[in-house]
């Protein structure tokens, strides 16, 4: 794909619209995108911010989708930035759309406004996790579908494999998250899903994966339902910040040698922080809908917004949606 159009939800996120404006400027300054490739969806903006982005295409959208907006309500808010952005995806006016707004509302807009791809029953949230091997580990579904059937795991695997291609992972290994590795472990849905994936010769299915193996080199794609996946994600996030907090407290309370040791390890500690910092990952893909849809973290700052725009741009150039085999 030669030229692309990437849309950004002006009102999405806790720090919007200022974080979105600054993120757009950050992306332009660092040459992630050109002014011709970036579209701001939403027009209720201060004159000061408007002056900063006057050279960009701005698409009118009046209604704000708040964190309290229910997924069903957004479908009636046809003048909201979220609805307009997903409609532009559907009409091929955008190649990708990024929002840091209400997750449930965005997933609803993606599914019912942009629409599902042919042959996909359940779109899913797909993201890359850090791992011991420094290769990305793909988690799908990370929170879109709390209640699933066994057949939906088949869709999740296809979506994960498409994302693996985007990350240059060849012949990715697919595993199902379970409470044990034995065939008889898990509930009936998980066991039925395992049989479905075993039968599909296109999948490099390696069986069950336990939660303690999340960061090991046991597989490349971890498939699970959205309820479990979202809890995995939030547990990881909470654990990471707890460890960092305890590390800082230990250094603060330690003696001279502890502080000197921390000084020598400063570069390594910074690398560790960057590895678990959501801002460096940009966003989560909602795959299975008609177009590249990226969910940025709700508390995204300008840097995180810029990174989300960058991954959306790369995915659009890669024709990620075309890589989901039907």
Swiss-Prot record:
Keyword RNA-binding attached: no
Keywords: Cytoplasm, Lipid biosynthesis, Lipid metabolism, Phospholipid biosynthesis, Phospholipid metabolism, Transferase
Primary localisation category: cytoplasm
Gene Ontology annotations for the cellular component aspect, listed alphabetically: cytoplasm
GO terms (BP aspect): fatty acid biosynthetic process; phospholipid biosynthetic process
Pfam families per record: FA_synthesis
A Gene Ontology molecular function term of the record: phosphate:acyl-[acyl carrier protein] acyltransferase activity
E.C. number: 2.3.1.274
Top-rank taxon, per record: Bacteria
Transmembrane segments: none
Pathway where it operates: Lipid metabolism; phospholipid metabolism
SUPFAM superfamilies in the cross-refs: Isocitrate/Isopropylmalate dehydrogenase-like
Catalytic reaction equation(s): a fatty acyl-[ACP] + phosphate = an acyl phosphate + holo-[ACP]
Family indicated by similarity: Belongs to the PlsX family.
Protein function: Catalyzes the reversible formation of acyl-phosphate (acyl-PO(4)) from acyl-[acyl-carrier-protein] (acyl-ACP). This enzyme utilizes acyl-ACP as fatty acyl donor, but not acyl-CoA.
UniProt name for this protein: Phosphate acyltransferase
Organism: Petrotoga mobilis (strain DSM 10674 / SJ95)
Recorded name of the encoding gene: plsX
């Amino acid at each position: 794909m030669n030229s692309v159009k990437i849309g950004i939800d002006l009102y999405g996120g806790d720090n919007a619209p200022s974080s979105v404006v600054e993120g757009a400027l950050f992306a332009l300054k660092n040459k992630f995108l050109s002014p011709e490739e970036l579209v701001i969806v939403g027009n209720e903006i201060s004159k000061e911010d408007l002056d900063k982005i006057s050279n960009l295409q701005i698409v009118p959208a009046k209604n704000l989708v708040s964190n309290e907006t229910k997924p069903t309500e957004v479908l009636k808010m046809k003048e909201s930035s979220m609805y307009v952005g997903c409609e532009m995806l559907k009409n091929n006016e955008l190649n990708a759309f990024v929002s840091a707004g209400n997750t449930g509302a965005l997933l609803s807009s993606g599914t019912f406004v942009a629409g599902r791809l042919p042959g996909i029953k359940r779109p899913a949230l797909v993201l890359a996790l850090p791992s011991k091997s420094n290769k990305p580990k793909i988690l799908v579904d990370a929170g879109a579908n709390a209640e699933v059937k066994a057949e939906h795991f088949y869709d999740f695997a296809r979506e994960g494999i498409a994302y693996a291609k985007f990350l240059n992972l060849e012949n990715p290994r697919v595993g199902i998250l379970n409470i044990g590795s034995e065939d008889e472990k898990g509930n009936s849905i998980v066991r039925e899903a395992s049989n479905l994936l075993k039968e599909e010769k296109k999948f490099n299915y390696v069986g069950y994966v336990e939660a303690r193996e999340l960061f090991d080199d046991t597989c490349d794609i971890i498939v699970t339902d959205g309820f479990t996946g979202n809890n995995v994600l939030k547990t990881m996030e909470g654990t990471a910040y707890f460890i960092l907090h305890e590390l800082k407290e230990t250094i603060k309370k330690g003696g001279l040698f502890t502080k000197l040791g921390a000084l020598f390890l400063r570069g390594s500690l910074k690398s560790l922080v960057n590895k678990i910092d959501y801002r460096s990952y940009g966003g989560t893909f909602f795959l299975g809908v008609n177009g590249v849809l990226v969910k940025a973290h709700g508390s995204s700052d300008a840097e995180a917004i810029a990174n989300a725009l960058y991954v959306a741009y790369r995915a659009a150039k890669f024709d990620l949606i075309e890589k989901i085999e039907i």
